[in-house]
């Protein structure tokens, strides 16, 4: 299966994570907790494409905890209970630390679905990490929110986005052997809207649409291809 560029270069360790220095930089509020493996139940709140899922996976990886993931869009109470039961069984088998249960788009869970998480969080069967693009104060039930710390992720800055582009060209196996000349980045950055995943999707679109040996990335070319793709 041909994975999207964003998935192929997804960071696997904290040192490769781009952006959110206020959380995971040298003085970040999560840095020491991750290093010590003392990760509380928490909510990651931020716009799309800002690294919420990646950060959750890295926290599990670096703290050597089992990692379970659910999407609130496709999961119901039955799925939640099944995963919690698996997490309870794995806890203590491979590690003394409780498993991480990551729920993407947790704001889409109903009250009853969120209620079904309470006992597992309260009794420490799992460490809950929820990701949301919506204000958790309005979308997460008070009983669950009071048991979680909330961390805000920001849209990627210009420097973050450019670093992401250069990392893609340097580290991705499929791009390494291509002669890519990044002449201009303004259109790419503007169209991304601070969304790292969207940036990489557009970048890959432009690269795949170019048949010549040398791939020149210019603002005009980016706009033409994106407009053509949107129309189609």
Residue ranges of predicted features:
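Conserved AAA+ ATPase "sensor/coupling" helix adjacent to the nucleotide-binding pocket
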Residues: 147, 160-175, 205-209
């Amino acid at each position: 299966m041909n994975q999207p560029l964003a998935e192929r270069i997804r960071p696997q360790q904290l040192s490769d994570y781009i952006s959110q220095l206020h959380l995971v930089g040298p003085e970040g509020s999560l840095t020491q907790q991750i290093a010590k493996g003392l990760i509380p139940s928490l909510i990651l709140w931020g716009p799309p494409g800002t690294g919420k899922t990646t950060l959750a996976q890295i926290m599990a990886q670096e703290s050597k905890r089992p990692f379970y993931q659910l999407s609130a869009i496709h999961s119901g109470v039955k799925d939640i209970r099944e995963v919690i039961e698996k997490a309870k069984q794995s806890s203590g088998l491979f590690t003394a630390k409780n498993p991480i249960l990551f729920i993407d788009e947790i704001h889409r869970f109903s009250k009853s679905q969120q209620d079904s998480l309470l006992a597992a969080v309260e009794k420490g069967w799992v460490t809950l990490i929820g990701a949301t693009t919506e204000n958790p104060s309005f979308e997460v039930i008070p009983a669950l929110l009071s048991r979680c710390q909330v961390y805000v992720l920001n849209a990627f800055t210009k420097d973050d986005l450019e670093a992401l582009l250069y990392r893609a060209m340097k580290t991705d196996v499929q791009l390494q052997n291509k002669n890519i000349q990044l002449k201009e980045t303004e259109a790419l950055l503007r169209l991304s809207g601070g969304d790292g995943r969207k940036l990489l999707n557009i970048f890959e679109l432009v690269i795949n649409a170019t048949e010549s040996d040398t791939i020149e990335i210019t603002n005009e070319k980016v706009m033409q291809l994106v407009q053509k793709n949107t129309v189609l």
